[in-house]
Structure formats: C-alpha cells, structure tokens
Amino acid sequence: MNKKNVRISALFVLISTCAFAQEKENVASEQVLEEVVVSDSKFALAKEKSGKVITKITNEELNNRPGQSVAAILNTVAGVEINGNQSAAGKNLGYYIRGGKNSQVLILIDGIPVNDASGISIEYDLRLLPAEQVESIEIMKGAASTLYGTGAATGVINIKLKKSDKKSVSGNGYFSVGTNATAIHQNQKASDFNQGFSVSGRTTKTTYFAALNSTEIKGISQIAPPNSNVSYEDDPFSRLNYLAKIGYKVTNKLTLDFFGNYDQIKNDYDGGFDNTGTSDTNLNKTSSKQFRFGFSPKFKYDKGEFVLNSS
C-alpha cells in the first residue's frame, strides 16, 4: 500500500512540473508579439491597451512598397485620404482623416509637431519627406486635442525616422529608374530617377545615422488635353534630403541625442487652361526648403525615465 502511494505522488509532481514549463513558454511568446504604439499617450504602450483607433505601418510594410511616396502609403489606410497623391509629381497635397481638413490633422516627426509657417493653413508639406528615411508610421484616428491641442481635432500622423543600426557599422544604398507614362501618353523613356544611401552604427557610448536621398522626375503637364496639337510644357519635380542623428551615452542613466535635417523641393506647375498653351510657361515655378535641428536628453531613474524633445 505504501509503495503505491509513493508512485502516484511522484507521477503528479512530474505532470505539474511539465504544465508549468509550458505556461512560461506561452507568456514569453506573447511578450515578443506585442505591438507597441506611442501616439495615444506619448509613452510606449501596448496597442491592445490603447483606447484609440491606431493603425501602424511597420518598417517591413514600408520595405514592401518600394518607389511609393509617403502620401501614397498613407492613402492606403482606411479613413485617411491624401488628395493629390495620384496626380503629377509636385502636386500640392491635402490630407483628411474622417472628413476633417488639413488644419485638423497633426503631423509629428519623431514625436515633435511640424508645420509650414509659409502656408495659409500652416500644415506640413508631405512632399518634403522621402519614404526611404521613414522607419514606421502611426495613424491615430479620432480627436486628440487633450494631448496635442486643437490642431489634432480629427487625428494624428506620427512619422518615425530611421535611427542607428545595432551593428557597429552598416550601410545601405539604392538607385531606381522609372518611366512617367499616363493612360493617354505611353512614354517609355527613363524620366523618374531615385537614388540615395545611408550609413549607421554604434560604439560603446556613441550611436550615429546619416542619410542622403534625392529624386529627379521629368514630370508631365496636367492640363494638356488628349490628341491636341498645342504644345504644353512638362512640369519637373526634384527633391533633396539630408538627415543626420548622433547620440552619446554620458552615464548609464543619461543619454544625449542630437539631429539635423534639411529638405528641399523644386517643381513647375501648370498655368490656367486656355486651349492655347500660352499661359503654361516655364515661369510657373515654386520651391520649398525646411531645416530642422533638435536636442533630446533622456534620463532614466528607478521607476521610469524623463525625456525632453526640442526642435
């Protein structure tokens, strides 16, 4: 009788131990798959714990859409409309979330609000930003005035730029050529050129990232009617972008991050349509430049961290 009791007890111990090991494995896998967002609370938060409707475009999804602009990628998100993204290169863009106008949508770059003071509604020009410099995009749909002010009445678009790689030194380069054909004019000549490169890495105390990107597009005329004998000029578009980031670890608790960014676009635009082409001249030009720099110290303490973003 005693021997049977001992054997049964040993069997139960083995079963309970195996079940416990399986439980730990499931918990570990759930932590790895957790998707984190920051637009909702300005702090890293699990997406399923967010009280807002947030769509995140990951770096993997961006890499699967080569050649597309930031505006074209955003236009694929339900509830987001980027007016003008399917038009000729250089076309001015309007962005709308749930029917709200440009001034009711806030654009963030690395968590910092950006705008264009030269415009009437001072909204940020998405044409300035190349998709090759973007790490991920978060779109929060719905009012967020309590966090970001009245400029976020219908939504927030938080664009996170790329940063240093985990390797000591790494680099990346690309070059692409495309045509600029339309449904009417099947132009097969090379007229769309995109090129760029980046280098990043880290040492014991320093991280760095630098990127140079450029785009040159011959362009087309949007007002040229089909089968017309009137000559209309093409409207070229060019963009040049520099981005540099550097971080320094002062102590185990204090880190200093610096960044500098220069964006420039130039493009021609069409004059009024009069069926003669006389108003569509090469004098119709516009250009836009933006220079941003910032400093972001981060201090860690026992129960959290203090971060200051300035730009």
State where each predicted segment sits.
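Flexible loop and strand-edge segments within Gram-negative outer membrane beta-barrel domains
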Residues: 23, 217-223, 229-243, 247-249, ...
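N-terminal periplasmic accessory domains that precede
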Residues: 35, 70-73, 93-96, 108, ...
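N-terminal periplasmic "start-of-domain" segments of outer-membrane beta-barrel proteins
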Residues: 35-65, 94
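Outer-envelope beta-barrel architecture signal
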Residues: 103-105, 167-173, 204-208, 240, ...
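Short acidic/polar hinge/loop motifs at secondary-structure boundaries
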Residues: 113-141
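Transmembrane beta-barrel strands of outer-membrane/channel proteins
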Residues: 171-179, 210-216, 258-264, 308-310
